[in-house]
Amino acid sequence: MDRVRIGVLSHAHGHASTYCQAMRDFPDVKLVASWDDDQTRGRQAAQAYGLEFRPDADAVIKDPRIDALIIASETNHHADLIERAAGAGKHILCQKPMATTLEDCDRIIAAVRRAGVKFSMAFQMRQDPVNRKMKQLLD
């Protein structure tokens, strides 16, 4: 079975830990490496989830063993990290919100389209049964 090899860019958002916890049990996923601009937080998370810690984001972004990246940094860093990740041909799951400005959203969209990589925002609550029912009632 082929495994999707995952890298994590920052553990600033708590959901990064949730993703890593869940993915450790997926037979078709391998957690490979992570980076965090807070090296203490990054090293602790890497150790907890069996990731290699890298003190440089580009070392994770350019790692040929990594297929996709989870970006869970502070929102003001999303556009820069996504441009670099997409440019390296990595598929991306980005923690919400996408960006702090419309200009950065446009940069992200352009980078992903230019690179032809898969991109998803982590808006998982759209599929929550209660939210779907509320939407149905409003429609």
Model-derived features: where do they sit?
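A contiguous active-site-proximal alpha/beta segment in oxidoreductase catalytic domains
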Residues: D2, A99-D139
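Acidic-histidine catalytic/liganding microenvironments
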Residues: F26, D63-P64, D128
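N-terminal Rossmann-like dinucleotide-binding module
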Residues: M1-Y49
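Alpha-helical elements of Rossmann-like donor-binding domains used by nucleotide-donor carbohydrate transfer enzymes
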Residues: T18, A22, Q44, A59, ...
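Beta-loop-alpha module in the N-terminal Rossmann-like domain of NAD(P)-dependent dehydrogenases
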Residues: D38, L51-A111
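Alpha-helical structural signal in soluble globular domains
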Residues: A22-F26, A45-A48, E83-A88, R107-A115, ...
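General small-molecule cofactor/ligand-binding pocket signal
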Residues: V32, R54, S120
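Short, Asp-centered acidic motifs that coordinate Mg2+ and/or phosphate
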Residues: A33, A68, K118
